Swiss-Prot record:
The gene is rpsP. Keywords: Ribonucleoprotein, Ribosomal protein. The keyword Ribonucleoprotein applies. Disulfide bonds: none annotated. Belongs to the bacterial ribosomal protein bS16 family. It comes from Stutzerimonas stutzeri (strain A1501). This is Small ribosomal subunit protein bS16. One of its GO terms (biological process) is translation. The keyword Transcription regulation does not apply. GO terms for cellular component: cytoplasm; small ribosomal subunit. It comes from the Bacteria.
């Protein structure tokens, strides 16, 4: 099954996540089909906290990709910010 989920990056104590489209059987930070955005939970000041390519996210959702719980929240938040 194709899923949209977060892949962790960054360094110790400073998480940074990429929103990735991947096969659900692949490791969390492993192989992916496409990166469609990023999420920086500890962004401060003028740093961008969330960036999502809405067109690609809509495409993958229309193709049957299942977002994780957290990604579903982030997509909703990004759609609200874009409107």
């Amino acid at each position: 099954m194709v899923t949209i989920r977060l892949a962790r990056g960054g360094s110790k104590k400073r998480p940074f996540y990429h929103l990735t489209v991947t096969n659900s059987r692949n490791p969390r930070d492993g192989r992916f089909v496409e990166r469609i955005g990023f999420f920086n939970p500890i962004a401060t000041g003028a740093e961008v906290k969330l960036s999502v390519n809405q067109e690609r996210a809509a495409y993958w959702l229309s193709q049957g990709a299942q977002p994780s719980e957290r990604v579903a929240q982030l997509l909703k938040e990004a759609a609200k910010a874009a409107a």
